Amino acid sequence: METNSSAAFSPLPVPTTFIVNVIHAHPGKQEEAFAIIQDVVHYVAERKEGFLWSTLAKSTDGQTVVNIEAIQAAGNVNEFFSDPVFAEKFRKLDDVSKSEFHTYTVGDLVLPKRVAAL
């Protein structure tokens, strides 16, 4: 199912909710942890209306993976975890990592204040 992305830049703070997963991979398991959270995020992106966008990144020291994910509202978290397929996919992280999961709401957007030289 193809959909149009609703992701867009806004120069003002918008009441967006973010999920931040910090995944502390077991030694030598960063790539596997990345693949698991990538699978989870793609599953959500393809099926859940509350999903807006995600950025997945690996630390350069090989120890962590982070998922910064924008969702429409904090209630989407319960919606995602109530899906048994999602929950099973997410639990696979326990085999290769210890992870933290936090929900945030935007409080400020800081942009550069420098004036470009001509």
For each feature predicted by the language model, list its residue ranges:
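Eukaryotic N-terminal targeting leaders
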Residues: 1-2, 118
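An amphipathic, aromatic/His-enriched active-site/gating alpha helix that lines ligand/cofactor pockets
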Residues: 2, 43-53, 70-105
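Short beta-strand/turn micro-motifs at beta-sheet edges
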Residues: 4-11, 54-56
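An N-terminal domain-start capping segment
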Residues: 8-20
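Short, well-ordered beta-strand segments in beta-rich or mixed alpha/beta enzyme
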Residues: 17-24, 52-84, 116-117
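Short, surface-exposed ligand-recognition loops at beta-strand->loop->(often short) alpha-helix junctions
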Residues: 24-35
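Short amphipathic alpha-helical/adjacent loop interface patches that line ligand
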Residues: 37-41
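Short, low-order "capping/linker" segments at domain edges
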Residues: 107-118
